[in-house]
Amino acid sequence: VAFAVTAAALSLAPAGSASAHDFLIGSSPAANSVQATPLSEVTLTFNDIVLNIGGSSSIVQVTDASGAHFETGCATTLDRTVSVPTALGRPGTYTVTYQVVSADGHTVSSTFTFDYQPPPGTTAAAGFAASRCGHAG
């Protein structure tokens, strides 16, 4: 009887976020923003918990117009937040490309850009030909 009541209650409940993919609700720097100071990390915040499968299921890459990579380590995941350490190069437009595993187990990926306009005299990192974590892209 208890099972039947529980099953009936669940069948009346609206489909919630458990069946929907996670989505980005914020980032630092923000999409389409101008970053005027040196940046030590890029942080992405999602609407639900991002799964951390084996410690390598979240990928975040930060590249410039030439395709050079400016992430200095691998992405880390904590609840709804994914971060990657960075050291940016010359002023210009940077692209953040991410792939995470949503709370429902599906992969979610997208990109956004921001402009980097540091003060004159700021040291520019050289960047890398490939991701520091061995991910293609």
Where are each of the predicted segments found?
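Short, surface-exposed alpha-helix to beta-strand junction/turn motifs within ectodomains of secreted
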Residues: 40-73
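Extracytoplasmic/periplasmic copper-protein system
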Residues: 17-25, 107-137
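N-terminal edge beta-strand
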Residues: 19-38
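Secretory targeting and sorting signals
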Residues: 1-20
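Extracellular Ig-like/FN3 beta-sandwich strand-entry sites
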Residues: 39, 91-93
